[in-house]
Amino acid sequence: GHRVALAALMLTVAAFFWRHLLTSDVLFFRDIASVHYPRAVELRSVLRDGLLPVWNPFEHFGEPVTANPNYLLFYPTTWLAWVLPPAYGFKLHYILHFFVLAAGSFFLARRAGLGPFPCYVAGAVFVFSGPILSLGNFYNLLPTTAWMPLVVLAADYQMRRGGWKGAGVFAAALTLQLFAGEPLTSIASVGLALGWALVFYGDFHAPFWAGANRRVFTRFVSG
C-alpha cells in the first residue's frame, strides 16, 4: 500500500545521495564552499567558546547573526553542523530536505486521492526534477522549497479541521518555512495553498466572495 510506496521513495532518495550519506564526500558548489560552510564552522567556534551565536566576529570585523536571514539561526537543521562533525552535519542540512520534498509531495498526492504508485511517481518526479536538484547549492532556498508541499498540506488540514488546532498546524508549518530565510518562497507557498483550498473546498459556480469561497477565505485568513 502507501506505506510500501513511501518506503520505496525514501530508499530511492537515499540511493541517489548514498555517497554523501555514507562517505566523507562534501558539498562545495558556489556559495556552499565560499559562504555557508565557513559560516557554519565560525558559529560552531563561537558556541564552543561558550557564547550564544548571535554575533559572528569572523565576518566583516564582526556582524550580527540574528539580523541576517541567510544564517538560518533559528532553523533546526542549521544546528546539525554545531552538534555533529561539521562537514557531515552541514551536508545533512541539504540532503535531509530532499527527503522532506519527496515525502511532502507523496503525501500531497495521496491527499489528492492518488494510489500508492502514482504517489511514488509524484514524489520521485518532483524531487529529481531539474529545478529542484538545481536548488542543492542554495542554503535557504532549498529548505523553504522543501516546505512548500507541507504548507499546502497544513492549509488543507486547516480547511478540514478548523479551530485552534488547524490554525496551529498551518501557522507552525509556515513559521518553520519562514525561519529557513527565503520569504518570497513562503509568499508563493501561501498563494499555492490558497489555490489548493479553493479547488478542493471552494465553489467555482458561486460568486467569488460568497458561499463556499467565502468560507475558504475566512478559514484561510483565520489560520
Protein language model features and the residues they cover:
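Polar helix-capping/helix-linker motif
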Residues: 1, 129, 210-211
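Membrane-interface starts of transmembrane alpha-helices
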Residues: 1-4, 85-93, 114-122, 166
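Start-transfer (signal-anchor) and selected internal transmembrane alpha helices
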Residues: 1-18, 215-222
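Membrane-embedded helix bundles of polyisoprenyl
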Residues: 9-12, 99-112, 116-203, 219-223
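Membrane-interface coil-to-helix junctions
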Residues: 12-105, 124-149
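Short, charged, surface-exposed loops that flank catalytic or proteolytic processing sites
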Residues: 163, 210-213
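Cytoplasmic membrane-interface regions of multi-pass membrane proteins
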Residues: 204-209
